[in-house]
Amino acid sequence: MGLSSTDKKDRRNMLFAAIPSICASSPKKISIYNEEMIVARCFIGFLIFSRKSLGKTFKETLDGRIESIQEELQQFFNPKQVIPGESNEQQRLLRISLRICSAVVESLPTAACAPKCEKTVQALLCRNLNVKSATLLNATSSRRIRLQDDIVTGFHFSVSERFVSGSTFKASTVEQIREAFVPIDLIREGLIVLRKV
């Protein structure tokens, strides 16, 4: 019985793997078996003997992955493609189960309490909104009072600084009056802004 071409290649590879161990010899023609040579021969032998089985396994895995990727790409580029019968059946069963679930939920005793719960939730939300709006109004009114106090204090300070007797600041009376009206304009603008708020 003759050897196939792959068997011949395997034997040739084994011969090439054995050559380094034969060549690695001492001057006295004694073969040296160090750890590196043993590891190298074991690795080469593993590659030779496992090439067939591992190659087939990797090839089958890669072929399956390639096919699944191609199917996904076809579905991605052709979304209007006809859906197989199995998926139609699954969708039909899903619709039926959803109908059953909704019927079961509606028949539960808690479903009868849903309108009352809805009214209670609405009442709570309205109460919370009223509390927050009242708090906001109180905060804005207190800020308005504080802003008016700050503006009046600044106005008194700037006017008293300008008109205090013995002031070294030399400016005309018209300029001093104009500068005194600036805080009044600020008060008006602040009140307008606060009314808008």
Swiss-Prot record:
Query: Gene Ontology cellular component?
Result: mitochondrial membrane; mitochondrion; proton-transporting ATP synthase complex
Main localisation = mitochondrion
- The residues that cross the membrane are 30-50
Q: Where in the cell is it found?
A: Mitochondrion membrane
Membrane topology type, per the record? Single-pass membrane protein
- Quote the subunit structure annotation: F-type ATPases have 2 components, CF(1) - the catalytic core - and CF(0) - the membrane proton channel. CF(1) has five subunits: alpha(3), beta(3), gamma(1), delta(1), epsilon(1). CF(0) has three main subunits: a, b and c.
The record describes the protein's role as: This is one of the chains of the nonenzymatic component (CF(0) subunit) of the mitochondrial ATPase complex.
In the record, the note on similarity to other proteins reads: Belongs to the ATPase protein MI25 family.
Write down what this protein is called.
ATP synthase protein MI25
Which species? Oryza sativa subsp. indica
